[in-house]
A protein has these predicted regions:
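N-terminal amphipathic/hydrophobic targeting modules at extreme N-termini
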Residues: 7-14, 64-65
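Asparagine/serine/threonine-enriched low-complexity, disordered tracts
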Residues: 17-28, 32-35, 39-42
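N-terminal glycine-/serine-/threonine-rich beta1-alpha1-beta2 phosphate-ribose binding loop
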Residues: 54-164
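Rossmann-fold NAD(P)-binding glycine/threonine-rich loop
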Residues: 155-160, 173-210
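Oxidoreductase and adenylate-handling cofactor-binding alpha/beta cores
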Residues: 206-219, 233-242, 272-286, 388
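Substrate-binding/catalytic subdomain of NAD(P)-dependent oxidoreductase enzymes
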Residues: 237, 246-351, 356-358
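Glycine-rich phosphate/pyrophosphate-binding beta-alpha loops
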Residues: 367-369, 373-379
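A conserved regulatory-domain signal marking ACT and ACT-like small-molecule sensing domains
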Residues: 384, 389-502
């Protein structure tokens, strides 16, 4: 660029800016005129005019309004346990990178905890407070991160933060599954963001694809392994032949399971996540109370061995399906359930081992999609929290809000009796003539078709392992009740659903 071209470019761009920004250039007006006259009188005017036009298209540096750096976005953190402490560390260690990605610095201004007398390495003690309510009500707080969990006081604190104009990032699956509608409505009314990627499957990005990337598609099913504790237990039972109690104790020793493992092993944790996934996938509000739930505490080594014998593996699955059947309101029904199930070893979810999570999505246009990764732990969950934090911070800088809740449908949730799938039934029977015929008749009378039968054992008793074709859950339950009344049936040892192709 020639020395006479730069003033023209700057001079033309300055017309779009306020006069106080242009005043330093006023004394150069004669210089501008002289240079323009030079171009007019010079030979090759056409070429000069072309150069003049080209020059004016180059952008000048955007001036700052007052020459001062923009103030930081102030962050309040609720909770400083495994996840919260990792979030606090990342906010400090990655401060420069976060600044570059957002365009504004993030400043951690307070951390709400239950007790102040605990030592928390690497975090400024002056940040800690036990007054969470006062922290979220501060007028200078722009962003609130909630990682304390549970229903209360988390719900009240999030609502207060939203009402005071702060955007919120939460990892609270239990609260979202119970009363997410109230929180989303409050965020929309306040014109701020409520993000929750970390609430489901840890570091796996599944909420955003369902909420944004696939929003133009029709999702027909979401099937996931969304609890790392139970997946670790079932994987060890499969690969090492260990029993449930033994493997649970091992998981507790390694920190994969809590001292009270009920929420994990009885499926409560997975049910909350299933409710969130179903709400996102089907644009209809589903709560944890709508989710049918069974845990894995009754899964035996015999179940694991039986699954292996038919080329399957046992997993605790969160299953969300869009049905073709319609409810009374004309909306298509959805089925949302959590329970152990046998799936073929060829299924993508079958190879998910250890404490890992995975979510398998099927949609009308995109087809089959698989999301896989670590589903729990401080670092993976903190990664998801920070991802949301960057997004809501960018929205804050632009003065905008991201997508809100998309629950425009009111889809009825089908009861478990209406679910249609295959079943694996293990029976202890007397090894007498006609027993197989009587059992087959029992299945037929209740409209359940047998796909395969396998007999094990010799002597006075035998074990029959039956896999059915697809049938309604209600029909299968009636069949099991009838089987228990047969004289030749000693025991219905186990009943487990079979998912996947077959």
């Amino acid at each position: 660029m020639g020395k006479n071209e730069l003033p023209l470019a700057v001079g033309q761009r300055l017309r779009d800016h306020p006069r106080d920004d242009t005043e330093p250039f006023t004394n150069n007006a004669g210089h501008f005129r002289n240079n323009t006259e030079h171009f007019r009188n010079d030979a090759g005017a056409d070429e000069r005019r072309e150069a003049e036009v080209t020059t004016t298209t180059e952008p000048a540096a955007r001036p700052q309004s007052d020459g001062q750096p923009m103030p930081p976005l102030r962050v309040a953190l609720l909770g400083c346990g495994t996840v919260g402490s990792e979030v606090a560390r990342l906010l400090t260690d990655s401060a420069d990178d976060l600044h570059a990605r957002i365009g504004r610095r993030l400043e951690l201004v307070g951390i709400a905890v239950r007790r102040l007398n605990r030592t928390r390495e690497g975090i400024d003690p002056a940040l800690f407070t036990t007054d969470a309510a006062a922290l979220v009500a501060r007028s200078d707080v722009d962003l609130v991160i909630e990682v304390i969990g549970g229903i209360e006081p988390a719900r009240s604190l999030i609502l207060s933060a939203l009402q005071h104009g702060a955007s919120v990032v939460t990892a609270n699956k239990a609260l979202l599954a119970e009363d997410g509608g109230t929180l989303f409505a409050a965020a929309e009314q306040a014109g701020v963001d409520l993000y929750f990627e970390a609430a489901v499957a840890g570091a796996i990005p599944i909420v955003r694809p369902l909420r944004e990337s696939l929003v133009g598609d029709e999702i027909t099913s979401v099937i996931g392994i969304v609890n790392g504790t139970t997946n670790y237990i079932l994987d060890k039972m499969d690969t090492e032949g260990a029993g449930f109690s033994e493997t649970l104790a091992d998981a507790q020793t390694l920190g994969y399971a809590e001292a009270d493992p009920t929420a994990d092993v009885e499926g409560f944790d997975a049910a909350a996540k299933a409710a969130i996934l179903a709400s996102l996938a089907f644009h209809s509000r589903v709560t944890a109370a709508d989710v049918y739930r069974e845990g894995i505490s009754e899964v035996t080594t015999s179940d694991i061995a039986s699954a292996r014998a038919i080329g399957s593996v046992v997993k605790l699955l969160a299953i969300c399906e869009l049905s073709d059947a319609e409810g009374d309101n004309g909306q298509r029904r959805v089925s949302v359930r959590v329970h152990p199930a046998m799936i073929p070893r060829s299924h993508p979810l079958a190879s998910v081992g250890g404490a890992y999570n995975a979510v398998f999505v099927e949609s009308r246009s995109a087809g089959r999609l698989m999301f896989y990764g670590p589903g729990a732990g401080g670092s993976p969950t903190a990664s998801a929290v920070l991802g949301d934090l960057v997004t809501v911070a960018r929205n804050r800088v632009r003065g905008a809000a991201g997508p809100g809740e998309s629950s425009y449908a009111a889809r009825p949730v089908s009861p478990i009796d209406d679910v249609v799938t295959r079943y694996h039934i293990s029976l202890e029977v007397a090894d007498v003539t006609g027993v197989l015929a009587s059992i087959a008749t029992c299945f037929a009378e209740h409209g359940v078709s047998i796909q395969t039968v396998r007999q094990q054992g010799r002597g006075s008793d035998a074990q029959l392992v039956i896999v059915t074709h697809r049938a309604r859950d209600a029909a299968l339950s009636a069949t099991v009740r009838a089987l228990r009344s047969l004289e030749a049936v000693r025991e219905v040892a186990s009943v487990m659903r079979v998912e996947g192709e077959g």
